[in-house]
Amino acid sequence: MPIDCKAKCGNRASLKRPKTGDALCKDCFFAAFEAEIHHTITTSKLFRRGEKVAVAASGGKDSTVLAHVLKLLNERHNYGLDLVLLSIDEGITGYRDDSLETVKQNRDDYQMPLKILSYEELYGWTMDRIVAQIGRSNNCTFCGVFRRQALDRGAKLLGVDSIATGHNADDIAETVLMNILRGDTARLRRCTDIRTGGGEDSIPRVKPLKYSYEKEIVMYAHYKKLVYFSTECVFAPNAYRGHARAFLKDLEKVRPSVIMDIIYSGEQLRFKDTVKKPVRGNCERCGFVSSQQPCKACVLLEGLNRGLPKLGIGKKSKGDRMIAKQNQELALRERANLVKNDF
């Protein structure tokens, strides 16, 4: 039996919102979805008039919907923003090369300038080459660290005031769970923040989709007929996040509100004064923001270049021992060569 739209617009309902359970027509769903993002942007004061904002674009559903909605709201509510697309090419054959074609389509559809930066030009490595050297057990560590810094590098190059990322409510709830399971209080402290970074030497990142459900983002993209890339990264099945995602989906079956419950719980967390806070500064090598010296990206890159790919994996003391061992071996070889030359 047909159901009337709960917004009482006179139309028949064509969908049920996963977030609220409301039966709505497509137009009322669009209006509600866009209004919630506008509310998030304005109440959290994510942008200021005249700012230049880079939309982190991957070609996936989240970044495509983010670019579409930001352009729409910018024009509808006169935010006065200068929007550009920033995309990172990790060098994953059969995945990123295809998704970049979608990003270029986004550029044309939304009339936004596009800047693409690659791991190859920034670090001299592609993810395909990195995985060939390290295997698939820690590849997401390398990719995540390099990608975060690559976005910072691209944002600095473009001269933007902030980076808007497509992190949605599901992503944030998953991250809260991951940090709890790992006992990572430093990341748990800031993972629900809608704005991170900022300050004298770093460009802030904002999450306009923080309270938007992944299912609703998919529905919005589907009914709006947006062009996006839906293939999963070929290296993703081995990611730790996948376990948190599966656990969250199981919880959602018995408690539909669990995503927002976890986010709200994360926002209300308070830590004892005795909990050590990471001190953020600038890397002594590359100059980008880091809470360690040298930064994680530089440590991982050094390991790759020295043939010690696991150098930055695990505790710092382990990496120090690996470097010391390699230096000792080099010294012994040099000494052996000197003795050989004397004869």
Curated annotation (Swiss-Prot):
Record-level GO cellular component terms: cytosol; cytosolic tRNA wobble base thiouridylase complex; mitochondrion
Localization annotation: Cytoplasm
EC number(s) recorded for this UniProt protein: 2.7.7.-
Gene Ontology terms describing biological process: protein urmylation; tRNA thio-modification; tRNA wobble position uridine thiolation; tRNA wobble uridine modification
Principal cellular location given in the protein's record: cytoplasm
UniProt keyword annotations, A-Z: Cytoplasm, RNA-binding, Transferase, tRNA processing, tRNA-binding
Highest taxon above the source species: Eukaryota
Biological pathway: tRNA modification; 5-methoxycarbonylmethyl-2-thiouridine-tRNA biosynthesis
Database matches in Gene3D superfamilies: HUPs
Any one Gene Ontology molecular-function term assigned to this protein's record: nucleotidyltransferase activity
Database matches in CDD domains: CTU1-like (cd01713)
Record-linked InterPro entries: CTU1-like_ATP-bd (IPR056369), CTU1_C (IPR032442), Ncs6/Tuc1/Ctu1 (IPR000541), Rossmann-like_a/b/a_fold (IPR014729), TilS/TtcA_N (IPR011063), tRNA_thiolation_TtcA_Ctu1 (IPR035107), UPF0021_CS (IPR020554)
Function: Plays a central role in 2-thiolation of mcm(5)S(2)U at tRNA wobble positions of tRNA(Lys), tRNA(Glu) and tRNA(Gln). Directly binds tRNAs and probably acts by catalyzing adenylation of tRNAs, an intermediate required for 2-thiolation. It is unclear whether it acts as a sulfurtransferase that transfers sulfur from thiocarboxylated URM1 onto the uridine of tRNAs at wobble position.
Stated family: Belongs to the TtcA family. CTU1/NCS6/ATPBD3 subfamily.
Name of protein: Cytoplasmic tRNA 2-thiolation protein 1
Annotated organism of origin: Drosophila mojavensis (Fruit fly)
Species lineage: Eukaryota, Metazoa, Ecdysozoa, Arthropoda, Hexapoda
